[in-house]
């Protein structure tokens, strides 16, 4: 069972009055997120790397873990915001603890459980456990006996790892996402309704797909929103026009084009490694 954020039911942004105030949140988001940003050389020294797992292998396992938690989330009909928060928790966890000692499915399930609390999209533990069983067995119709060993195994895994996850995250529940910022940017720079809708859809898929990578640990939500806009405009052939004459749009929002292109290239790496899981989004390298 393959998971593609590009084809998920949660591709389109939710209509939320709070989006109108996104511009006021951008500075706070950038400042708040800084403590969880890591430099490239730090990914060569993760706990998993110290346990003898090459980062190339760790990246693959991280991607599988996020795919698992996303499938569980779709079974539970969770909004994309909750899934992104769960994925961010997942990636942060493995900057503190080794993937060799803590299986990515176990932590993925726990991240879903905790993210539903943090985002106030609560689901019953029973329903989360049943969804984990079905996704793990690759059987959407699987009948789960609540007294079965499999049911109790997943239930115990989630409850046991919840405290471990909380400690690894330093009880930091404020996890900003790029979605509201992205909507603000598309409204700011793309005035044509048809182009804006197409661009928003593609850029939204970029953010969804980026959850399978470590981009949330490398760049702030503001940079990721800008990268999504840049990549989406390339895919949709939509011109993004700055409001101020003589400046590029990324200069107006004070985001480095070097960072934007680096984020796009990380997504190109993901596409090249698993194109069958990327839906219609074809991420290409930016020189």
List the predicted regions and their residue ranges:
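Eukaryotic basic, amphipathic alpha-helical target segments in cytosolic regions
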Residues: 94-98, 119-122, 136, 169, ...
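Acidic, Ser/Thr/Pro-rich regulatory low-complexity segments at or just upstream of the first helical elements
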Residues: 1-102, 114-141, 147, 159-164
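C-terminal region detector
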Residues: 3-11, 211-226, 231-287
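Surface-exposed interaction/gating patches
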Residues: 72, 118, 152-241
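Charged, alpha-helix-forming regions
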Residues: 118-119, 125-147, 152-156, 240, ...
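Short amphipathic alpha-helical segments embedded in low-complexity Lys/Glu-rich regions
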Residues: 102-107, 127-132, 145, 178-184, ...
């Amino acid at each position: 069972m393959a998971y593609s954020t590009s084809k998920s039911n949660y591709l389109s942004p939710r209509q939320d009055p709070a989006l109108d105030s996104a511009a006021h949140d951008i500075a706070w988001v950038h400042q708040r997120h800084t403590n969880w940003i890591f430099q490239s050389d730090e990914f060569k020294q993760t706990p998993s790397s110290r346990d003898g797992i090459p980062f190339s292998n760790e990246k693959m396992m991280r991607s599988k873990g996020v795919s698992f938690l996303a499938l569980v989330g779709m079974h539970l009909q969770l909004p994309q915001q909750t899934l992104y928060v769960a994925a961010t928790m997942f990636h942060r966890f493995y900057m503190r603890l080794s993937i060799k000692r803590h299986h990515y499915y176990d932590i993925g399930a726990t991240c879903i459980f905790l993210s539903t609390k943090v985002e106030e999209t609560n689901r019953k533990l029973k329903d989360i456990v049943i969804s984990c069983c079905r996704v793990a067995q690759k059987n959407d119709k699987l009948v789960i006996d609540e007294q079965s060993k499999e049911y109790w195994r997943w239930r115990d895994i989630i409850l046991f790892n919840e405290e471990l996850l909380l400690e690894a995250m330093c009880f930091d529940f404020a996890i900003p996402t790029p979605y509201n910022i992205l909507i603000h940017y598309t409204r700011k720079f793309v005035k044509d309704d048809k182009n804006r809708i197409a661009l928003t859809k593609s850029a939204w898929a970029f953010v969804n797909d980026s959850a399978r990578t470590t981009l949330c640990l490398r760049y702030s939500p503001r940079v990721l929103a800008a990268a999504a806009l840049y990549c989406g405009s390339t895919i949709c052939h939509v011109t993004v026009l700055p409001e101020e004459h003589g400046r590029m749009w990324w200069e107006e929002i004070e985001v480095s084009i070097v960072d934007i292109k680096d984020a796009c290239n990380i997504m190109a790496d993901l596409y090249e490694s698993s194109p069958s899981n990327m839906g219609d989004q074809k991420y290409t390298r930016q020189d």
